[in-house]
From Swiss-Prot:
Residues that hold substrate according to the record: 123-124
UniProt protein name: Cholinesterase
Source species of the chain: Oryctolagus cuniculus
Annotated InterPro entries: AB_hydrolase_fold, AChE-related_enzymes, AChE_tetra, CarbesteraseB, Carboxylesterase_B_AS, Carboxylesterase_B_CS, Cholinesterase
Its job: Esterase with broad substrate specificity. Contributes to the inactivation of the neurotransmitter acetylcholine. Can degrade neurotoxic organophosphate esters.
Biological-process GO terms, alphabetical: acetylcholine catabolic process; choline metabolic process
Lineage: Eukaryota, Metazoa, Chordata, Craniata, Vertebrata
Length: 581
């Protein structure tokens, strides 16, 4: 039920936990009602730190859902102080462990049975919050008359620390947070005019990886209908870590903060008593090598949310049977290069040498054998025009983008479609006119989001007319997909987006010109990453060990030879002495 009191324009809705008050926002000559900061779980404080989220109890008053809630505790990116390009991703509300809240935007007048789109933010499972300006749901709600929902979930050690098998810190808490928010939507969205049987998950980067994990997690299956994955998938190399690795990282963190003991329960108890800030300061040191794309604490195969590695589940077809829409941006790698790859800077053109390219490979592929790195260098060298100055800069962008985002996303889509599900793939190639990063960084990771959420529609923000048209077309396709399982909807005037099949692999380009259809995106490079590179690792992964063993063996043999020689000399001198009698 909705009641309006005329003087304050507040909107009150009754949920299963109690009444909440929303706020009316003017959007493009109409109104959207927003409910910001609705609690969906008990605050994970004290003894609940590191545990799965617990359901909420009821409240008796009216909950004021008129402003964004706290963001979850996380480290802040301070690499480029005062620079909007990096700071736009930093939390814009207070940080707290009390952060399990969600937001709902509904059209007015209140719809009946509207399609729901649930956004899951990215940030490598280490950072992120639902209150960022680029995730504002009001434009999408107003233009497409869908209900938009977004939730905060725990990140970093507080969201993903794991001692596998121990209920005190089972791992994947951040994913269980998301799952509980999906349950909240199932129970409550009808009161907002939403249809619980028409729910599409969408997310970017680690958010898209999360969406694809919900596709692989049986408990999530009844909680949504369809899925959109922007620049991320669960089979990416940075995505899921083994139980062994997760456990080691927990023990390393415990050591750093002075919680090392034999007893696991004692370790967790000790970690619970530490200040959140101390955990944040130390969690960045748990990865033993200096890598630029490291997920310190992230999803694990816990046997509960995730029963096996994503690759295996995809192979076995253990996934939700539904439609997916997946895609990537043209320059997925550049965003990571300016955070420490040799020779790269946001303040110059970052023309790098072959040597710097090789140094870069060391940073992005720690632990990979020399032969492995050599094979990447060989595959990504432009042998036709070796002297072109931009070559190595573009090559490292491609290496990082192909390996971490583009090829895993294509592979996921291919496998998913092989199980008889309709899939649609896009390639986003428009560089926003508002992009604060330098020209050479191209169409960057994360910069399609503003077009999905309709930011270019706001006239006073100074996007170009062509960008407004592109944004409207993307919003229309995303909403069509959410409503009907097909981005084409009913209009015939725009380019039809073909279904992606594992044989032809057709995809659509998204840009300010007219969209085009191509086949087999980056086929050559992705064959390298999915087929050749794993073989190289398999064959050479233990070359270093073999070399060590050989050296040790040679050393032992050398010692035997020396000993034998000494014995022999000893023997001959004695023999000579005997012969002289």
């Amino acid at each position: 039920m909705v009641t309006r009191s005329s003087h304050t324009e507040d909107v009150i809705i009754t949920t299963k936990n109690g009444r909440i008050r929303g706020i009316n926002l003017p959007v493009f000559g109409g109104t959207v009602t927003a409910f910001l900061g609705i609690p969906y779980a008990q605050p994970p404080l004290g003894r609940l730190r590191f545990k799965k989220p617990q359901s909420l109890t009821k409240w008796s008053d009216i909950w004021n859902a008129t402003k964004y809630a706290n963001s979850c505790c996380q480290n802040i990116d301070q690499s480029f102080p005062g620079f909007h390009g990096s700071e736009m991703w930093n939390p814009n509300t207070d940080l707290s462990e009390d952060c399990l809240y969600l937001n709902v935007w509904i059209p007015t007048p209140k719809p009946k049975n509207a399609t729901v789109m649930i956004w899951i933010y990215g940030g490598g499972f280490q950072t992120g919050t639902s209150s960022l300006q680029v995730y504002d749901g009001k434009f999408l709600t107003r233009v497409e008359r869908v209900i938009v929902v977004s939730m905060n979930y725990r990140v970093g050690a507080l969201g993903f620390l794991a001692l596998p098998g121990n209920p005190e810190a089972p791992g994947n808490m951040g994913l269980f947070d998301q799952q509980l928010a999906l349950q909240w939507v199932q129970k409550n969205i009808a009161a907002f005019g939403g249809n619980p049987k028409s729910v599409t998950l969408f997310g970017e980067s680690a958010g898209a990886a999360s969406v694809s994990l919900h596709l692989l997690s049986p408990r999530s299956h009844p909680l949504f209908t369809r899925a959109i994955l922007q620049s991320g998938s669960s089979n990416a190399p940075w995505e899921v870590m083994s139980l062994h690795e997760a456990r080691n990282r927990t023990l390393t963190l415990a050591k750093f903060v002075g919680c090392s003991t034999e007893n696991e329960t004692e370790i967790i108890k000790c970690l619970r008593n530490k200040d959140a800030q101390e955990i944040l300061l130390n969690e960045v040191f748990v990865v033993p090598f200096d890598s630029l794309l490291s997920v310190n604490f992230g999803p694990t195969v816990d046997g509960d949310f995730l029963t096996d590695m994503p690759d295996t589940l995809l192979q076995l077809g253990q996934l939700k049977k539904t439609q997916i829409l997946v895609g990537v941006n043209k320059d997925e790698g550049t965003a990571f290069l300016v955070y420490g790859a040799p020779g790269f800077s946001k303040d110059n053109t970052s023309i790098i040498t072959r040597k710097e390219f090789q140094e870069g490979l060391k940073i992005f592929f720690p632990g990979v054998s020399e032969f492995g790195k050599e094979s990447i260098l060989f595959h990504y060298t432009d042998w036709v025009d070796e002297q072109r100055p931009e070559n190595y800069r573009e090559a490292l962008d491609d290496v990082v983008g192909d390996y971490n985002f583009i090829c895993p996303a294509l592979e996921f889509t291919k496998k998913f479609s092989e199980w008889g599900n309709n899939a649609f793939f896009y390639y986003f190639e428009h560089r926003s006119s508002k992009l604060p990063w330098p020209e050479w960084m191209g169409v960057m990771h994360g910069y399609e989001i503003e077009f999905v959420f309709g930011l270019p529609l706001e006239r006073r923000v100074n996007y170009t007319k062509a960008e407004e048209i592109l944004s409207r077309s993307i919003m229309k396709r995303w909403a069509n997909f959410a409503k009907y399982g097909n981005p084409n909807g009913t209009q015939n005037n725009s380019t039809r987006w073909p279904v992606f099949k594992s044989t032809e692999q057709k995809y659509l380009t998204l840009n300010t010109e007219s969209p085009r259809i191509y086949t087999k995106l980056r086929a050559q490079q992705c064959r390298f990453w999915t087929l050749f590179f794993p073989k190289v690792l398999e064959m050479t992964g233990n070359i270093d060990e073999a070399e060590q063993e050989w050296k040790a063996g040679f050393h032992r043999w050398n010692n035997y030879m020396m000993a034998w020689k000494n014995h022999f000399n000893d023997y001959t001198s004695k023999k000579e002495r005997c012969a002289g009698f």
